[in-house]
A protein has these predicted regions:
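Short gly/pro-enriched beta-turn/loop segments at secondary-structure junctions
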Residues: 60-63, 128
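Helix N-cap motif at beta-to-alpha junctions
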Residues: 26-31, 73-76, 138
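Core RNA-modification/binding signature centered on pseudouridine synthases
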Residues: 91-179
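Short, conserved, surface-exposed binding loops centered on an aromatic residue
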Residues: 56-60, 121-124
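Short, charge-patterned binding micro-sites
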Residues: 1-26, 54-58
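Short amphipathic alpha-helices in soluble, non-transmembrane regions
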Residues: 31-42, 77-90, 147-149
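Short glycine-/aliphatic-rich beta-strand segments at the starts of folded cytosolic domains
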Residues: 19-23, 62-72
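Acidic, low-complexity central loop/insert segments
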Residues: 47-54
């Protein structure tokens, strides 16, 4: 039977430039036919970029590349975020509570984010701080950028910060683009 599966659904409130979808259809159709039919029924704001045979298995997704923007009320507040967040990233550990499962029960698990972060850089742009993040994303380990941002904001002593988070790419364990 036909199906549609998103191997790594996007969190609510995030935007993306790279969602991947696995579909199965009945009958013979070309990639162009599939693309045309899907474009006709795509929700507003979603754009189909391409349809092609998969090169990799969804299980090969290991990381995601994100850009996050934290929006402050004043440049001084943005500048004040950097030392605390930088110290947290340079520390020995960054322990957070992450929702998880134990069997069928939902539990809170304590994890150290620092060894899981593949890449993190920060830069101030006037009233904003731009972060470039590569975080685990996949079947084995999945770290939401919101979880990391929550921890950095707490360590920097800021709250009620506006956020924009965009997923740019899904990546393999070798940090190659998932295809």
């Amino acid at each position: 039977p036909p199906y549609m599966l998103s191997p790594l659904p996007l969190s609510l409130g995030f935007s993306s430039q790279c969602e991947s979808m696995d579909i199965r259809i009945e009958g013979e159709m070309t990639d162009a036919d599939i693309a045309g039919r899907m474009r006709d029924v795509m929700p507003e704001g979603l754009r189909l970029l391409s349809v092609r045979e998969p090169v990799m298995q969804p299980s090969e997704i290991a990381f995601a590349d994100y850009r996050a923007q934290l929006c402050f009320d004043a440049p001084e507040l943005a500048a004040g975020f950097l030392p605390g967040a930088g110290a947290a990233l340079a520390g020995e550990s960054l322990i957070v509570q992450k929702p998880g499962k134990s069997g069928r029960k939902k539990v809170m698990k304590e994890i150290d984010l620092l060894p899981l972060i593949a890449s993190c850089s920060m830069e101030q742009k006037e009233r904003a701080v731009l972060l470039k993040l590569i975080l685990p994303a996949g079947n084995q380990t999945n770290i939401s950028p919101a979880l990391l941002l929550d921890a950095l904001e707490e360590k920097a002593g800021v709250q009620d910060v506006g956020r924009e988070i965009t997923r740019l790419e899904l990546l393999t364990k070798d940090l190659q683009m998932f295809e």
